[in-house]
Design a protein with these regions (language model features):
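Accessory, non-catalytic peripheral segments of nucleic-acid enzymes
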Residues: 222-353
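Structural motif
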Residues: 3, 43, 123-124, 150, ...
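Divalent metal-coordination and catalytic microenvironments
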Residues: 8, 28, 44, 49, ...
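Short, conserved loop/helix-junction motifs that constitute active-site signature segments
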Residues: 73-76, 142-145, 174-179, 259-260
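Conserved beta-sheet core of the metallophosphoesterase superfamily
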Residues: 163-228
């Protein structure tokens, strides 16, 4: 039996921005559901954070969620299971009130706010929602008692990659899940593997942190117990490097920007010797109708040829802030202050300016 795994879909991201809804629809209309139909897959497990806002939902976003996902699931006779994530609940200490129960309790959808073991074919799988104070004891006991060797959940595990270049230092220990042959989880938006823990990542780019990070969904085969990654080719964030030194006009002005419509674009100017060419270059880029264009001048002449060079030349924002907190003179717990800073930073990433 093959099961489609998808997680962290975050409907309503960036203040319910319409261009993100359009971008998400392309993925579901052209990639996700056609793949399931072509491969005769009729079961989906969503590993949490189906919506973005914790306390309410925009009606336009709700209609989009129904039209692009839930109605198609119903029309195609797909068996949908949703694990409750931290963005699906308004309170930090309980999953009792959650988006799936309040919005879709009349739909034929199975959702899990407490740890459960469900048989998919002949394979028992432990489904683990977001763990908080109210369900912690039940979650731990269920993991001990379950006969399942596979666990799917929405977990915060220390020692795993939170985003590229940043390891999560908080949450449960990797060893807490050692009894399972395979653990697949949502919550962190970048794909990673730590021992038997597989973070699946979100299906599309939501912030600049996702730039050039592989996005998509997975297929789990209950017979082989293997995960297959299906990549989403659509991108929301793009970078263009401008350098007219020693170039002909045609080299600069014949670039193809047709794929940039509805996306965010950063133009990194390394050498700008001909202002007229640059103006023409920018005019052509604007005609492609991107959502936002940001120009970044490489005024330090760092000769940064690609994005890996840029990353290697600078510390990330969280590291800089953590070092600042570490060097502060304060009576407040620096660990608690650092945790608060990281939480606020992650929240800010998803706010539309």
């Amino acid at each position: 039996m093959k099961i489609a795994l998808i997680t962290d879909t975050h409907w309503g991201v960036r203040n319910d921005a319409h261009h993100f809804l359009d971008y998400m629809a392309k993925f579901y209309d052209n990639i996700f559901f056609p793949y399931l139909e072509d491969n005769r897959i009729d079961t989906i497990i969503h590993l949490g954070d189906i919506v973005d806002r914790r306390k309410y939902i925009n009606f336009v976003t709700l209609r989009h969620l129904k039209d692009t996902f839930l109605n198609k699931v119903t029309d195609k006779g797909i068996d949908l299971h949703v694990i409750i994530g931290n963005h699906d609940v308004p309170y930090k200490n309980t999953n009792e009130i959650n988006s799936m129960q309040e919005l879709f309790d009349k739909h034929d959808v199975s959702y899990y706010s407490e740890a459960s073991t469900v048989n998919f074919g002949d394979t028992p799988i432990c489904l683990m929602p977001w763990i908080n104070n109210s369900n912690y004891a039940q979650a731990i006991q269920h993991m001990k008692d379950t006969p399942a060797q596979i666990l799917f959940g929405h977990l915060e595990i220390a020692g795993c990659l939170m985003m590229r270049g940043q390891i999560n230092e908080h949450g449960m220990d990797v060893g807490d899940f050692s009894k399972f042959d395979l653990v697949a989880s949502g919550h962190f938006h970048t794909k990673s593997v730590t021992k038997n823990i597989h973070y699946l990542g979100c299906p599309y780019e939501l912030t600049w942190s996702d730039y050039q990070d592989p996005k998509g969904f997975h297929i789990f085969d209950t017979d082989t117990r293997e995960l297959e990654f299906v990549r989403n080719p659509y991108r929301m964030f793009n970078k263009v490097f401008y350098d007219d030194s020693g170039k002909e006009a045609s080299d600069i002005l014949e670039k193809d920007f047709s794929g940039f419509e509805g996306s965010y674009v950063k133009v990194v100017t390394q050498n700008k010797e001909n202002p007229y060419w640059f103006d023409q270059f920018m005019d052509k880029l604007y005609q492609a109708n991107p959502v936002n264009i940001q120009i970044v001048d490489d005024h330090l002449n760092l000769n940064l040829e690609d994005d890996s060079d840029i990353v290697n030349e600078a510390e990330d924002t969280v590291t800089i802030l953590s070092k600042y907190i570490e060097n502060m003179e304060t009576n407040v717990s620096k660990k608690r202050l650092d945790n608060l800073m990281r939480s606020l930073y992650n929240e800010a990433l998803y706010m539309e300016v």
